[in-house]
Amino acid sequence: QYVYPVLPYAPIHHYTVPVQVSTQYHAQDILGQFAFHHAGDNQVRTETKSFDGSVRGLYGYVDPTGKLVNVHYVADSNGFRVVGANNLPEAPSAPAVPDVKGPEPVQDTPEVVAARAAFQKSYDEAAQAAAVSPDVQVS
C-alpha cells in the first residue's frame, strides 16, 4: 500500500474588495440656472450656474502620488479663474537686488566746452540778425 505524503499548503485568505460609492445629482430651472454634483472613482466635481451666466465650482481628484487635489474656480464675464487650489506651484523668491552705483557722468573736455561756446555765440548772432531782417514781413 502507498501512502501519500502530506503536502504543505498555502492558507486561504478571503479578501473583500471595497466597493466604489458613486453619488450624483442635477437640478435645473427654466432660467438656465443649474447645480450638479458627481463623486466617485477617486474624483469629485460640483458646479452651479447663476442666472447671469456665471459659473462657480470645484473639482478634486487623487493624483498619482496619492495626494488629494482640490481646485475651486469661477467662470464669468472676466473669464475662467482659479480662486483656490492646492496643486499650484510656488514661485521662487526673488533674489535681493544688489546695491550698485552707476558710472559717473562724462565730463566735457576743454575742446568740447570751447566748441559749445563758439556754437552758442554763432547761434545768438544768427538769431539777432533774423530778428532785425525777418524773411516774412510782420505787420
Curated annotation (Swiss-Prot):
Keyword presence, 4Fe-4S = no
Residues annotated as carrying Pyrrolidone carboxylic acid in the record are 1
Q: Name one GO molecular function term.
A: structural constituent of chitin-based larval cuticle
Positions of transmembrane segments: none
Q: Where is the Chitin-binding type R&R domain?
A: 31-92
Task: Alphabetically list the UniProt keywords.
Answer: Cuticle, Pyrrolidone carboxylic acid
GO cellular component terms listed in the entry, alphabetical order: chitin-based extracellular matrix
User: Does the UniProt entry include the keyword Magnesium?
Assistant: no
Q: What is this protein called?
A: Cuticle protein 6
Q: Which organism is it from?
A: Blaberus craniifer
